[in-house]
Regions:
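N-terminal active-site segment of His-dependent metallophosphoesterases
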Residues: 2-88
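Short, solvent-exposed loop/turn segments at secondary-structure junctions
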Residues: 44, 229-232, 238, 267
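A general structural motif
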Residues: 31, 78, 97, 217-219, ...
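Extended active-site neighborhood of metal-dependent phosphoesterases/phosphodiesterases
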Residues: 3-26, 51-55, 89-216, 241-254, ...
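Short acidic, glycine-rich surface-loop motifs adjacent to enzyme active sites
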Residues: 211-231
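Histidine-centered catalytic micro-motifs
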Residues: 222-228, 256-266
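Active-site glycine-centered loops adjacent to acidic/histidine catalytic or metal-binding residues
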Residues: 39, 85-86, 105-106, 225, ...
């Protein structure tokens, strides 16, 4: 049975989308499996609301993470965990008995500068940048992008990347509050301060990494806090230069899925080149006694996302 997620950015025509009764293929073991969670944003403050009036459960989100860690620790075949960004505390992740790979989000950068954040999260970045890659099996490569490479947050005042981002926002967003998309139309709504861009050096690295994966006949999963597709995400959550990133990705056949956080509602799409896009439902927006986390089983021909509660199951078959 195929289901669509109402207002969650899922395109009902995407027949390779979501199922309620998701099951592993009979007789096949995954090549590897990994846990996923995004946008925990725990804080010891009263519940609040987003810019759009969506409830946020700041104190409860830590319980979502605790239940996720407990579930992952008991999963015999889980290989690692990916946190898709926006955490304010790290100690719960330290209870994981599997390796945890972190992506940085805007709320991470609001709380700590990069020079403190990256060592704390054990991100193997260079020159303060948080992009890297690893290969959990010979058949696959995971590529992690730093969506706040060019950003008005996280870098020191006066840093060239900060100045470049502020200059860019001044041209693109006429509002005095650069976090507001008011008056911006369509895809231009992404030009807000809580988003960012992938810089030139990182784009060249991505291109080289995908070239190498192609030579090795590896499939690639690209991960970034910020989404790259406006069907799988609200327009105002998109990476500023998502089009440049996707232009590189679409030059190769190796990238099978782009996974992200930031959007909070969650969403799914398949683009015109057959690349799957999945933005994950936020732990922050789980009312008490509900959850949003999951794990992904990776096969040679598909990804199967098994979600807890508000995290929707997703079946992602590859075209080739």
């Amino acid at each position: 049975m195929i289901t669509a997620m109402g207002n969650s950015g899922i395109c009902p025509g995407d027949v390779m989308g979501l199922t309620n009764g998701l099951a592993s293929p009979p007789g096949k073991k995954p090549l590897f499996s990994f846990g996923i969670i995004s946008d925990v944003q725990y804080a010891d403050i009263p519940d609040g609301h987003s810019f759009h009036g969506v409830p946020r459960y700041y104190r409860h989100s830590i319980h979502v993470l605790q239940r996720a860690i407990q579930e992952w620790n008991s999963h015999q075949d889980l290989n690692f965990v990916i946190n898709f960004g926006d955490i304010k505390v790290n100690y719960e992740f330290q209870k994981s008995n599997r390796p945890v790979y972190h992506l940085i989000g805007n709320h991470c950068l609001y709380n700590l500068p990069r020079d403190k954040l990256l060592p704390l999260l054990k991100i193997p970045g260079i020159n303060g940048l948080a992009y890297y890659e690893f290969s959990p099996s010979p058949e696959y490569r995971i590529v992690v992008l730093d969506g706040y490479d060019i950003s008005a947050i996280g870098w020191p005042q006066g840093h060239p990347k900060t100045l470049k981002a502020l200059e860019f926002l001044e041209k693109k967003n006429p509002n005095s509050d650069k976090n507001s998309p008011e008056g911006l139309q369509g895809l231009d709504r992404r030009f807000v301060m809580f988003n960012g861009a992938v810089g030139r050096e990182q784009l060249e690295w991505l291109d080289g990494t995908l070239q190498d994966a192609t030579k090795l006949k590896q499939k690639v999963i690209v991960c970034c806090h910020l989404p790259f597709d406006d069907v799988a995400s609200d327009q105002e959550a998109l990476l500023w230069n998502y089009d440049e990133v996707m232009n590189i990705i679409h030059q190769y056949n190796c990238v099978k899925a782009c996974l992200s956080g930031h959007d909070h509602r969650g969403g799914y799409s398949i683009d015109s080149h057959g690349v799957h896009h999945r933005s994950f439902e936020a732990a922050l927006e789980c009312p008490p006694d509900t959850d949003a986390y999951g794990h992904i089983d990776v096969y040679d021909d598909r990804l199967l996302l098994f979600g807890a509660d508000r995290m929707q199951n997703t079946e992602m078959y590859f075209n080739s």
